[in-house]
């Protein structure tokens, strides 16, 4: 009888031993594997939201994976800044270099634009959306402003006009006026 009761105790103890072993393994795993940060989780969620918008609104021209189709160029490596500019201004370049497509009405919220930008940025490296300290004029001295003016005259005024008023260009293209364009979009257009 003594042997029989020992067997019963062992049989009853097996589930508890298994539970304890699983608990030890789980605790060890949680110590060894670093937890994902809330920033990573938010970025993953933002990319998923961007993919949902992209699949419905962009993939018919740019392909399901941004690889490009005959109606739209590849977006691999264009970066978040390019997407923010295109979607934030409604200005998408023509895919084959013909006359410029007129600007469309901006129909997405900044949150949606940020989500699609994050999704497209996941295709490959490219320019990020700049921080406001990179494009806001606050804190610039007279020398920096003069340098910016010289850069504009050398690189931008031929199309946008000496005062940024825009104008007609060859082959049916048109350079838009820059007066109402947000600083971030001008910065992104220059970088992308």
Predicted regions mapped to residue ranges:
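Detector for the c-type heme attachment site
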Residues: 55, 61-67, 79-80, 88, ...
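Extracytoplasmic electron-transfer domains, predominantly the class I c-type cytochrome c fold
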Residues: 76-124, 172-192
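Sequence/structural segment immediately N-terminal to covalent heme-attachment motifs in c-type
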Residues: 44-60, 84, 141-163, 187-188
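Short, intrinsically disordered, charge-balanced linker/junction segments flanking boundaries
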Residues: 130-132, 137, 160, 169-172, ...
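N-terminal export/targeting leaders of redox proteins
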Residues: 1-46
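Electrostatic cytochrome c docking/interface patches
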Residues: 30-52, 69, 125-151, 171
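Sequence context of c-type cytochrome heme-c attachment sites
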Residues: 2, 32-41, 63, 91-105
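Extracytoplasmic low-complexity, Pro/Thr/Ser/Ala/Gly-rich segments
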Residues: 38-73, 77-85, 90
């Amino acid at each position: 009888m003594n042997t029989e009761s020992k067997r019963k105790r062992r049989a009853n103890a097996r589930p508890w031993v298994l539970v304890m072993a699983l608990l030890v393994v789980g605790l060890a795993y949680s110590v060894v594997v670093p937890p994902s940060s809330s920033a990573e989780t938010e970025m993953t969620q933002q990319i998923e939201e961007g993919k949902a918008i992209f699949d419905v609104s962009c993939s018919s021209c740019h392909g399901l994976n941004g690889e490009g189709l005959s109606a739209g160029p590849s977006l691999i490596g264009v970066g978040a800044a390019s997407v923010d500019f295109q979607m934030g201004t409604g200005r998408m370049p023509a895919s084959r270099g013909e006359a410029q497509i007129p600007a469309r009405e901006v129909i997405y919220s900044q949150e949606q634009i940020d989500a699609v930008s994050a999704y497209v940025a996941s295709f490959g490296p490219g320019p990020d959306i700049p921080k406001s300290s990179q494009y806001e004029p606050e804190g610039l001295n007279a020398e920096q402003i003069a340098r910016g003016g010289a850069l504009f005259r050398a690189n931008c005024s031929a199309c946008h006009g000496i005062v940024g008023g825009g104008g007609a260009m060859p082959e049916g293209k048109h350079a838009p006026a820059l007066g109402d364009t947000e600083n971030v979009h001008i910065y992104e257009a220059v970088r992308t």
